[in-house]
Curated annotation (Swiss-Prot):
PROSITE patterns: ZINC_FINGER_C2H2_1, ZINC_FINGER_C2H2_2. Its main location: nucleus. A zinc finger (C2H2-type) spans 4-26, 194-216, 243-265. This is Zinc finger protein ZAT4. Residues 80-96 have a biased composition (Acidic residues). GO terms for cellular component: nucleus. GO terms for molecular function: DNA-binding transcription factor activity; zinc ion binding. Keywords: Metal-binding, Nucleus, Repeat, Transcription, Transcription regulation, Zinc, Zinc-finger.
């Protein structure tokens, strides 16, 4: 019961319709009072004598205008409150009736009532509506332009950053590769083919070329080893001493064999100490001739034998 209560006389009513009829009576009385107040103000202005001083005229006009404005503002506020109460009561009644008749359409009716209430409220508080409507559109267009510009700028920056990152990655990959491999790759690559510089063979992929180069490296290693062995052998042969007998000019593989051979010459020389030098030379020549002769009855001597066979008849 407290909900349907008049704000002016504080009377309570059963429903909103009864309260609305009661509020209309208040509105009629208020409008009559407003007409009376405005009529009195006009009469006072007309009956005002013209011979008063300027100061008195100013003060009275200010007082009357201020009182008139105050009364008008008060009446406007009362009208707004009454109309707001009427709209609220009508909304409540329509909601209750719609819920009883058709509860499924409650949402749509509520939205319509809210829209009508907003429209009435805008009518009551109209103060340059065209300006109020035009300003948000201006702000929205500006915001749209700014957002589009920001998006375009962001896309440009992202594309630049991505390009820089790709460029840095490529530089890192190139730095990781050795200079030798990169030079070989560039020189060997011709029209999508990979050519070996040493033998001139062409391969379809860089991996095949790498395997082929490995074989070349192995061959080079073997060649270097054989060359080293040959050089060492030649140097060793040059460095070896020649063990040659000064008497019979026979060559021996070692100094020990040469020494034993010289002892044989010394024994012969010692046995013939009484002989002359010419005889000794003659004997040595005969020995050398005998050594040169080959006895077919004897087996052939081995080349690896360090000692030489001396055929003595004595």
């Amino acid at each position: 019961m407290e909900r349907y209560k008049c704000r002016f006389c504080f009377k309570s009513f059963i429903n909103g319709r009864a309260l609305g009829g009661h509020m209309r009576s208040h509105m009629l009385t208020l409008s009559a009072e407003r007409c009376v107040i405005t009529g009195e103000a006009e009469e006072e202005v007309e009956e005002r004598p013209s011979q008063l001083c300027d100061d008195d005229d100013d003060t009275e006009s200010d007082a009357s205008s201020s009182s008139g404005e105050f009364d008008n503002q008060k009446m406007n506020r009362l009208d707004d409150e009454l109309e707001f109460d009427f709209a609220e009561d009508d909304d409540v009644e329509s909601e209750t009736e719609s819920s009883r008749i058709n509860p499924t359409r409650r949402r749509s009716k509520r939205t319509r009532k809210l829209g009508s209430f907003d429209f009435d409220f805008e009518k009551l508080t109209t103060s340059q509506p065209s300006e109020l409507v035009a300003e948000p559109e201006h702000h929205s267009s500006a915001s749209d332009t700014t957002t589009e510009e920001d998006l375009a700028f962001c896309l440009i920056m992202l594309s630049r950053d991505k390009w820089k990152q790709q460029k840095k990655k490529k530089q890192r990959v190139e730095e990781d590769e050795t200079d030798h491999d990169s030079e070989d790759y560039k020189s060997s690559k011709s029209r999508g083919r990979f050519k070996c510089e040493t033998c001139g063979k062409v391969f379809k992929s860089y991996q095949a070329l790498g395997g082929h180069r490995a074989s070349h490296k192995k061959n080079k290693a073997c060649m270097t080893k054989t060359e080293q062995v040959e050089t060492e052998y030649v140097l060793g042969v040059k460095e070896k001493k020649v063990h040659e007998c000064p008497i019979c000019f026979r060559v021996f593989t070692s100094g020990q064999a040469l020494g034993g051979h010289k002892r044989s010459h010394g024994s012969n020389i010692g046995a013939g100490r009484g002989l002359s030098v010419s005889q000794i030379v003659q004997i040595e020549e005969e020995v050398s001739v005998k050594q040169r002769m080959i006895d077919l009855n004897l087996p052939a001597p081995n080349e690896e034998d360090e000692t030489s066979l001396v055929f003595d008849e004595w």
